[in-house]
Amino acid sequence: LAEFFPGQDAGRSWCYDVEIGAHQLVPTGVLAPRGREVERIVDHMEDVQFLADGWFDYPAAANRADWYNLGGFSKVQPYYTRNCEVYALRDEVKPFIRSYFNSIAALINPEVLTLWEHFHHSGAWDKTHETGYFLHQTRTMLVQERGEDLWLAPFITSKWLEDGQGVTVRKAPTRFGTVAYEIIPHPQANYVEARIEPPARRLPKQIVLRLRHPEGKPMRSVAVNGKK
């Protein structure tokens, strides 16, 4: 769009090549998440668009110098961009987590914990759309339907399974009904405890709980209701 309408929308038509660009065809079901086209789209977003000159706090030189912390999100209105959804559909855990937290850091108002429209000081404050999409991403982090399967904790950070940490989810809405679960790590004893209250309206074909050890150690055994 930028080459054809460079002055549109306060001179920011360039951002629509990525924020409402071709990647939107993935979560809407037009492009297969694991297709070669989608891999190229995501690579271009990460390597080019997310590191280009953005609004206010994000000049290209700074983005490229600190690509890990300042990458992973678009540079005008990050929650227009659905790259976290694309990562979730591709089951790419670490890219999802990076984009999730980097976007929050770019938009959060630390005084009242609301979300700006355009980064730390610009646009609407306490923005409804940004709040809604933050909740949408958080829900995907904690609960995700995959066909007739229900995944729990599919994209949580492994830091939450360190000593003294844990995850508790209550009354999470899914198309199977509400679900609840709790993950309690016991790193000193080398095990993780999980309690699940499955949905009652319609049972999923499978309930999948993802547990990633903070140090990357493999799982040795599993016991369900006391039975291995």
Residue spans of the language-model regions?
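Active-site core of glycosidic bond-cleaving carbohydrate-active enzymes
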Residues: 2-146, 205
